A protein has these predicted regions:
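Regulatory loop-to-helix N-cap segments in sensory/regulatory domains
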Residues: 1-7, 126, 139, 154-156, ...
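Signal-transmission/dimerization alpha-helices at domain junctions
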Residues: 1-3, 108-112, 158-161, 181-203, ...
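Signal-transmission linkers at sensory-effector interfaces
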Residues: 1-35, 42-43, 65, 199-213, ...
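Helix-loop-beta substructure at the N-terminus of cytosolic sensory domains
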Residues: 25-77, 95-102, 109, 225-229, ...
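GAF sensory/regulatory domain recognition
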Residues: 50-97, 120-121, 159, 289-302, ...
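Regulatory sensory and allosteric helical modules in signal-transduction proteins
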Residues: 71-139, 367, 383-386, 392-393, ...
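A short, aliphatic-rich beta-strand micro-motif
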Residues: 141-157
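Divalent-cation-assisted or electrostatically stabilized phosphate/pyrophosphate-binding catalytic cores
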Residues: 174-178, 214, 284-309, 367, ...
Length: 573
């Protein structure tokens, strides 16, 4: 080898090395494929080229990108223009390798094919190429087709270059042995870079599918959560996109990289993963007396005993008090039972007078199993006296504690560096701007923008949800009125709420997910006009104290509730 050829070879390999480093740093799949072809064309000064990728499922070669300089053609890759050519079968209909096409031959044989003139070969079918040339007044002559082999010696694609050109005259020439050697080295490095990227993408898809499976299982665990875990990511991404697109205001500098978008999506899908530890009988508690069953039926049986006793006394006394008194007693029992049934639903705020009536009814005595006992147990009375909703304070703490479990579960996972904020994003959607949320009592300044976005998404989805058996979904205007009050009261970030309204995210979501009859007019001006009072934040040590105080209260209570089912306390020792 003469000195000039040696220098060219060394220079070419050095270029391959530099290109290989650049390829290994490229994170975008389409850009990587495009760069592989562009660099290969440059190394050989080729007029055009194609990258095919193997579709293992269909056993075909699929067109990934096509470039041709003299025809000014660019399809696939990052161009946004699709390649409307069908995939090429790697095997014939009888299962034998398809050796008629040069690209599929290379994919099957794992050997490079260097053709001086496509019109002069007989062992490959170039009829399609010739027809293309006629239509486009082009002349395809020299072809260099190389397999792209990964570390496992598996073909993941094929690189094909067309019409090498003299760098001085521009005339079409053959691909020389040196050019072939250099491009083979490039194809090898490119295949490894591409394979690594494809493996990362496959791992990401697997992780996303697994996470979505967990979210679907949580939604399926209880009809009371419906499709919440599936829809919160939708609202989260819509509002985040609006923040990234903002060109003025508080979010004009806000943006996310591809990795940060992935991190946010993972967090949104996992935001309620702690609910896997929440007892179903607490999460699905639709009436005040419901546990594994609704204990109102047991109370009804006790009232039947009282009715029986009243009628027996009437018979035993010979009717001395008269039928009217019996009717009065039975009517009073019926009224008290109906009152307890209404109280059990928890649909309205319970007044102190109604709570007192529950206690008086509960204090009555009943004789069962040879024992004299109160009509209602202390636990019955406590539950029936719940002022709002159906949960006791202890049960509410257990429900709220799903955030503790979410944070603990996620913080225990060995997330890579680009996913390290998943616990923070997912664990903050019940926090409020004024520090009155749970479980950590964070303030606005303690929370990232994505965490605050997720808080809005969680509230909005919960209020508009139509698939909850215990409530009707609210109209769009009702939902936004509630969220406007939450903005005023420092529960939701006011700047993000304004963006939520101005960008129209709330309406686009509603038009997609809500029945048309509930998508009504919203007074946007009134919401935007709300200006919350200035917050006065306590010292950081006081803010941290809320988290420290929450755990000691939470763990014994969740232990008591779960203990009834002989379930170990999550995170307990």
């Amino acid at each position: 080898m003469d000195k000039f050829a040696l220098e060219r070879r060394i220079a070419g390999l050095e270029l391959v090395h530099r290109v290989g480093l650049a390829l290994s740093a490229e994170r975008n799949h389409n850009r990587l494929i495009e760069r592989i072809l562009v660099e290969a064309k440059e190394l050989c000064h080729a007029d055009g080229g194609t990258v095919y990728l193997v579709n293992e499922k269909n056993d075909t070669l699929e067109f990934a990108i096509m470039l041709n300089d003299s025809m000014r053609t660019a399809l696939g890759g990052t161009t946004g223009r699709p390649i409307e050519l069908p995939p090429i079968p790697i095997r014939a209909a009888d299962g034998t390798p398809n050796h008629n096409n040069v690209a599929t031959y290379v994919a099957s044989s794992k050997q490079t094919v260097n053709i001086e003139d496509a019109y002069a070969v007989a062992n490959f079918d170039f009829s399609g190429t010739k027809a293309f040339d006629v239509r486009n007044k082009y002349r395809s002559r020299s072809f260099l087709t190389l397999p792209m082999l990964n570390n496992g010696d598996e073909v993941i694609g094929v690189l094909q270059l067309i019409n090498a050109r003299d760098r001085v005259t521009g005339e079409v020439m053959n691909f020389g042995a040196l050019e072939q050697e250099i491009v083979e080295a490039l194809a090898s490095q490119a295949a490894i870079a591409l394979d690594n990227q494809m493996l990362i993408q496959q791992q990401r898809r697997l992780m996303e599918a697994f996470i979505q499976m967990i979210a679907a299982a949580i939604d399926a665990k209880s009809p009371y959560t419906g499709g919440h875990c599936e829809r919160v990511p939708v609202v989260t991404e819509m509002l985040t996109r609006a923040a990234c697109d903002a060109r003025e205001g508080p979010f004009q500098q806000f943006d996310l990289t591809d990795d940060e978008w992935y991190e946010l999506r993972i967090a949104a899908w996992l935001h309620d993963c702690g609910k896997v530890t929440t007892p179903v009988h607490v999460m699905d508690k639709s009436t005040k007396l419901e546990t594994i069953c609704d204990r109102i039926d047991i109370v009804k049986m006790r009232f039947e005993v009282l009715r029986r006793d009243a009628m027996l006394r009437h018979v035993e006394d010979g009717g001395k008090l008269g039928d009217a008194e019996l009717v009065r007693q039975l009517t009073a029992l019926q009224e008290d039972m109906e009152f307890l049934e209404r109280a059990n639903v928890g649909g309205e705020t319970m007044s102190p007078a109604d709570q007192q009536r529950v206690r008086e009814i509960g204090a009555r005595r009943i004789f069962v199993d040879g024992r004299d006992r109160p009509l209602l147990s202390d636990d019955d009375v406590e539950n029936l006296c719940i002022m709002r909703g159906t949960l006791t304070d202890a049960e509410r703490l257990v429900i709220n504690g799903h955030m503790v479990q979410t944070i603990r579960m996620l913080e225990a996972l060995p997330f890579p560096r680009d996913l390290r904020r998943v616990p923070e994003y997912a664990g903050g959607h019940h926090e409020t701007m004024d520090g009155c949320g749970y479980p950590k009592g964070l303030f606005a300044g303690d929370m990232s923008i994505p965490a605050r976005i997720m808080a809005i998404a969680d509230v909005f989805e919960a209020l508009t949800a139509q698939d909850r058996p215990y409530k009707k979904g609210k109209s769009l205007s009702e939902t936004m009125e509630i969220m406007a009050r939450m903005k005023r009261d420092h529960h939701l970030d006011p700047d993000l709420m304004d963006l939520f309204v101005r960008s129209g995210v709330y309406r686009r979501y509603a038009e997609r997910y809500l029945p048309p009859g509930l998508v009504d007019a919203v007074d946007e001006a009134a919401i935007l006009a709300i200006r919350p009072a200035q917050l006065s934040l306590p010292e950081i040590q006081d803010r941290r104290k809320r988290w420290a105080d929450f755990l000691p209260r939470y763990r014994p209570l969740v232990g008591n509730v779960l203990g009834a089912l002989s379930v170990p306390v999550p995170g307990g020792h």
